Design a protein with these regions (language model features):
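Conserved "cap/hinge" positions at secondary-structure junctions
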Residues: 91, 107-108, 184, 208, ...
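Glycine-rich phosphate-binding loop and adjacent beta-alpha segment
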Residues: 120, 249-315, 345
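Glycine-rich beta-strand-centered segment in the early N-terminal region that forms part
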Residues: 27-44, 58-109, 148
Length: 345
């Protein structure tokens, strides 16, 4: 099969607005020992793409510093964490049987080789990603999903959004019969949380607004709460016995509605990074605040099992060609959509 010598890609050479996304003709990367070369079938967009491009992650002790996910980025950088495609070449020491297989790439760069390793870097940030026709990845991080009934577009939506959601659900120890509250339910992670929590047998309450409410209900939420109305009042009506797990922001007003031993799992800062709450509601009720950055290798393996069996149905909000990456990111930033935005090289 093989690959050509050059490819189309979209890179950033500095932090800034959508205008720093530059189409380029670059050399196709060569898979090193232990790596594979993947022809990109689809790449999904994430808030991480916007924050990385803007340098919005801050640094310890300096929250306003321009920074990538885990520190300074090496420019120029090809963005894009979420890739589905086919293996077209393998590096030294890699089983040639992977060639031709349909795969999803785990974009995390881990702090170790164990099953519970933590992500300390991300494809598209700490190494080149999938805003391109081809991308390399460690062979240990590509998962064969040839048998999955999902399309490449759907598979590409899984790594960051569904990986983050599954990490939240696992770290929050959500079990069958419990009640989970999903805030920001119309986004990629929100829809993923709803679908995975439903598959787990939990009761799902979701917060959304306006025209998105119907789509969030269609995604599987048992009850959709209107952000424009009194949230605590709606929660008390929908779950008088309280909430077991909160997935997302809203801590101040929702913390008193957690059950004894309830868990609040945070995986982002879209609602702002400066949060105030009454710490007495935390310790008097044995509640927990849990930070959750993406997923572990174990979590990602569980996610790929769901994908092979087709037990989740990702929602595609829009599709763009690769050369419209700036427009695709602007669409993502407007937050008018439900589900995931994908690009097809």
């Amino acid at each position: 099969m093989g690959a050509p010598e050059t490819m189309r890609a979209v890179r950033i050479a500095e932090h800034g607005g959508p205008e720093v996304l530059e189409p380029a003709e670059v050399a196709v990367p060569v898979p090193q020992a232990g790596e594979v070369l993947v022809e990109v079938g689809a790449v999904a967009l994430n808030n991480t793409d916007l924050w990385t491009r803007e340098g919005a992650y801050g640094r310890p002790g300096d929250p306003k510093a321009l920074s990538g996910w885990r520190g300074p980025i090496g420019f120029p950088r090809i963005q894009g964490a979420d890739v589905a495609g086919r293996v077209v070449a393998v590096g030294a020491g890699v089983d040639g049987g992977l060639t031709g297989r349909r795969v999803v790439v785990d974009p995390a760069i881990y702090d170790g080789d164990g099953p519970d390793a933590n992500p300390v870097g991300l494809m598209g940030s700490e190494r080149d990603g999938g805003y391109a026709e081809y991308v390399t990845a460690p062979a240990t991080r590509v998962h064969d999903v040839t048998e999955s009934p999902l399309t490449d577009d759907q598979l590409a939506t899984l790594p960051t959004a569904y990986g983050t959601a599954l990490g939240m659900i696992e770290r929050g120890r959500l079990t069958r019969g419990e009640t989970v509250l999903v805030s920001g339910a119309s986004g990629g992670v929100g829809i993923a949380l709803i679908q995975i929590a439903r598959a787990r047998g939990a009761k799902v309450l979701a917060i959304s607004s306006g025209p998105k409410i119907g789509a969030v209900r269609d995604a599987g939420a048992h009850e959709v709460l209107d952000r424009a109305r009194d949230i605590p009042e709606q929660i008390r009506a929908a779950a008088p016995e309280g909430i077991d797990v909160v997935a997302g922001d809203l801590v101040g007003e929702v913390l008193p509605l957690l059950r004894e031993g309830g868990r609040w799992v945070v995986a982002g800062a879209l609602g702002g990074y400066d949060v105030t709450f009454d710490v007495r509601r935390l310790y008097l009720h044995n509640a927990q605040v849990i930070g959750s950055a993406m997923h572990t290798p174990t979590h990602f393996g569980l996610l790929m099992d769901l994908a092979r069996r087709g037990e989740i149905q990702p929602v595609i909000a829009a599709r763009f060609p690769l050369d419209q990456a700036a427009e695709a990111q602007e669409e993502l930033a407007r937050r008018g959509h439900v589900g995931k935005i994908v690009m097809r090289p």
